[in-house]
């Protein structure tokens, strides 16, 4: 849900048979056939829905979703995701990327496989430097590779990463303090329903290449947020909170399972959120916060400035539907 200059963006999809994830309260949009991407914008007082250009996701029965968005200004925003598109020879899954120039969205050409390619998250540092990450899977080899794409202002280029596995691979979050200090987290999972083995994935970009680091927790990493080159935070599936000190990652505490988002405003102001859970760290101790009224889960976050924090999630207005929820604090 990242945005800048007080403008927040939420991305998701609209389904004909559901409300779709992350449609904020107060925003209205028609429910269209198939799974078509949707982008909502907060201008400081109201929500509105931005139109995307027609393309492969406009094809009947196409199922598309946008899962990451980031902007370095109100006139330079990139959104990424994936679409499953019907073709004459079958279904293909391809990565999606769109750019907002302050007036309209345009679709960007994404390099990579046409067999199975998806982008999950993006972070923009300037109009000529943004990174998108995801997974590229090959049906021929059975390998899943962590994908990293760099935007130079006019085109994407693929940058090699050290993560390749025959197991299932998920890339769950990206966060960086600069173009030479970027973190990506996720996990690999052995196939099957029983006795599955998880392995946490941590990658770091130093401005010239990606490196894989050892994680002290192997339940899978769900989110990461960097404060400085010597201070970054991550949340694991088993509730462990990890911290980077400039040299190594360590587990600093273990909270309840079900936490999926971590927001670090500073070294003394860290929030962890999840399913009916909100916990705050003040630099000394962790304190459980009152559950936001009516919200069942918080799953994403954006820090616009010190003390200006947004969470996105969902709630259940009835047993039949799931509705989006947005939580905002301007006090830190």
Where are these regions (language model features)?
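Residue-level hotspots at or immediately adjacent to binding/recognition sites across diverse folds
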Residues: 1-332
């Amino acid at each position: 849900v990242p945005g800048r200059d007080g403008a927040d963006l939420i991305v998701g999809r609209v389904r004909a048979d559901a409300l779709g994830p992350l449609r904020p309260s107060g925003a209205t949009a028609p429910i269209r056939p198939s799974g078509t991407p949707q982008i909502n914008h907060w201008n400081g007082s109201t929500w509105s829905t931005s139109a995307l250009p027609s393309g492969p996701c406009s094809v009947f029965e196409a199922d598309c979703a946008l899962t990451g968005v980031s902007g370095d200004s109100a006139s330079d925003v990139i959104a990424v995701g994936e679409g499953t598109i019907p073709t004459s020879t079958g279904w293909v899954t391809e990565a999606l990327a769109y750019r907002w120039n302050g007036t309209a969205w345009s679709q960007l050409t994404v390099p990579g496989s046409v067999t199975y390619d998806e982008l999950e998250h993006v972070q923009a540092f300037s109009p000529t430097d943004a990174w998108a990450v995801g997974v590229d899977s090959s049906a021929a080899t059975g390998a899943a590779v962590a994908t990293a794409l760099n935007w130079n202002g006019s085109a994407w280029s693929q940058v090699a990463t050290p993560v390749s596995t025959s197991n299932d691979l998920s890339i769950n979050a990206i966060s960086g303090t600069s173009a030479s200090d970027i973190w990506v987290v996720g996990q690999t999972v052995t196939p099957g329903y029983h006795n599955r083995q998880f392995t946490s994935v941590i990658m770091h970009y130093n401005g010239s290449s990606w490196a894989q680091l050892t994680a002290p927790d192997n339940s899978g990493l769900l989110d990461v947020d960097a404060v400085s080159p010597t201070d970054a935070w991550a949340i694991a599936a088993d509730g462990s909170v990890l911290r980077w000190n400039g040299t190594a990652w360590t587990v600093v505490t273990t909270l309840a399972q079900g936490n999926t988002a971590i927001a670090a405003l500073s070294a003394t102001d860290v929030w962890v959120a999840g399913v009916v859970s909100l916990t705050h760290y003040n630099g000394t101790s962790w304190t459980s916060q009152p559950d936001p009224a009516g919200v069942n889960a918080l799953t994403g976050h954006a820090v616009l400035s010190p003390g200006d924090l947004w969470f996105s999630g969902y709630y259940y207005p009835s047993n039949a539907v799931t509705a989006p929820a947005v939580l905002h604090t301007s006090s830190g």
